[in-house]
Amino acid sequence: MINIVKKDFMASIIVFLVALPLAIGISIACGLPIYSGIVSGIIGGIVVGLFSGNSLQVPGPAAGLILIIVEIIHTMGVEKLFLIIFLVGLLQILFGLMSFGKWFRAISPAIIQGMLAGIGISIFLSQFHIMLDSKPNNDFLLNIKDLLSIIYNSVLPLDGSPHHLACMTGIITIACIIGWKFLPCKKLHAIPSALVGIIVASLLANFMHFNISYIQVGQNFWSNINFISPQDLSNLFNSSVIINALVITFIASAETLLTSTAIDKMSENSKTDYDKEIIAQGIGNSLSGFLGGLPITGVIVRSAAN
C-alpha cells in the first residue's frame, strides 16, 4: 500500500510539472489570461478524473484546439467562446448517454492524426515566430511568407534587436528536449524532457540577464473568473455557436478517445469505458466553460507522464 502511494505521489508531481507550464502556454497562445488554462487543468485533473472511464488518462487544455479558439475569439468574442465550451460539455454528456463512444472509435486514426498534424503545422509556424522573438500573423500563409526574413533577423540582428538571444534560447531548449532521451542513465528518463527544457531555458535566461517579459498574474488570481450570465445563455441556440460547438466536440472527443486507445496499448492495466469517458469530459467542459476555462481533452503528453 505504501509503495502504491509513493508511486502515485511521484507520478502526480511529474504530471503537475508537465501540465502546469502546458496549461499556461496554451492560455497565452490563445490570447487568454493564464487563469483560463489553469482552471481547465484543475477541472480536468479533479472533476474529470473522478468520473473518468480511464484511470490513467490526465485531461486538460489541448494545443490542438488553439487555432480554433483564436478564430472564435477573433470573430465572435471571448464571451461566446466560453458559451461554446459550455455547449461542448452538454453535447459530450448527451453523446455519452446515447453510447456514441463506439462510433468515435470507428473513425480512422489516420484521419484524426492527419487533421491534428495540419493543425500542428500551423501552430508550429506561429510559435516559431515567437521563438525568434517575432510577432506571428493571424494568417497561416503570411507566417510562411515571413519565415526567411525572421530567420535572417535572428542570425544577423542588424537593428540591434535581441532576436538572436531568443533564437539561441529556443535552440538550446529544443536540443535539451531531444538530447535528454539519449542519456545513458535510464533512471533520468523518468523526468519528462519538456520539463528539463523549461528548467534549462529559465536558468539560461536568468543567468544571462535577458530582458524578460514576465506573465502578469495580478493580486487576486480568482478575480478573473468569468461566469456565464443568463444573457449569454440566450445565445445558446445561435447557429454560429452550435456549429463551432459541434466542431470542437468532434475534435475533442476524437482526440480523447484516441488518447485512451493509446494508453490502453501502453498499459496492461488500462481498459477504457469510452461512453463513460465522454460523459466525464462533458462534465468537465461544461464546468470549464461556465467558469471561463479552456476546452478539456485527453492529451497523450500528460497521460504518458502518468
Label the predicted regions.
Residues M1-N306:
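Transmembrane helical cores of multi-pass ion-transport proteins
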